[in-house]
Amino acid sequence: MTRSIALLGSTGSIGRQTLEVARELGLTVAALTANSSVDLIEQQAREFCPRLAVLYDEAAAAELRERLRDMKTQVLSGMEGLLAAATAEDADTVVTAVVGMIGLKPTLAAIERGKRIALANKETLVCAGTLVMDAAEKFGAEIVPVDSEHSAIFQCVQGCRDRGEIKRLILTCSGGPFYGLTREQLAGKTRADALRHPNWTMGAKITVDSATLMNKGLEIIEAMRLYRLPLRQVDAIIHRQSIVHSLVEYRDGAMLAQLGTPDMKLPIRYAMTYPYRAETPDRTLDLLSCPPLTFAAPDEETFRCLKLARQCAAVGGTACAILNGANEEAVGAFLRDAVGFNDIPALVEAALETVEQVSALTLEEILAADHAAREAVRAHI
């Protein structure tokens, strides 16, 4: 069970909820990192008194350093700071709650120190899953997923003695705010529309990914990497109520599911306490007041990001890094109102068609593919 954490991405949605859980469980916080949110990380530092606080932005870090002069907390910046936080000797668990490829190097560094990784940064496994899982095996690092779907799968395979017993993993998907709409209806959807998720409160980027269904596509790839399963054994279904968080079907026909309220603190808490469970102060699921649970197939022709993700998962190599980098850039442009909603899959597809794909997977090739994908999207905007 976790006693002390280094939290990468403390000011985002997952980061803030992780600190709520840390407060409940009485965990020590050894390190906090964020991009540039000086006010919030200062508040967090004053409450949790970490040994290390990192702001990626150097100017913001300089301001934080001045504000925390009365504390013993050391303030660092940039990738050097992130790596220092990820390898902090006084943290036994590193929570990777940063968004995007920026989490890859710190995650690998933490793995090389044999840390437990509470993984909320799906891009790390999407782009470099084989490297990450091989490194975890080599250095004896434990990876416990924080995504609600992958936490559900993780819990449902705890009694599985042989991965050969698994027939398939079934990831559930709310369908997002635009479920049931046509491509023509999607064309006029705005940033504000996309950020109104029906069930979950999340950061802007992942909420848009949920609206395009790219989030589910990335999660399919993540599940393949986590459990070393082929694409044919990982499915996604629409479940509007977000009560069943995912399922595992075994070869004997048994199907195990994890149910709960749509609250990210549940998988966060489990990642902190695994292999044990802690009492929760939060509202729990009342089966007698549940709405009817429904399931449906996703519409991959309308929501093409899911289809593109499946295609990249089948190809392998740097295709997934190109997919992810292009999507991050396209979603960023959408959030700036620079492109429309339907432009997101179009830009991702254009990058996949123009950026060279290679089958080998070194860290340098992954980073190069990510950079090229972003440049390709920028060129089309």
Question: Positions of the model-derived regions?
Answer:
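Catalytic, metal-anchored helix/loop core of enzyme active sites in primary metabolism
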Residues: M1-I381
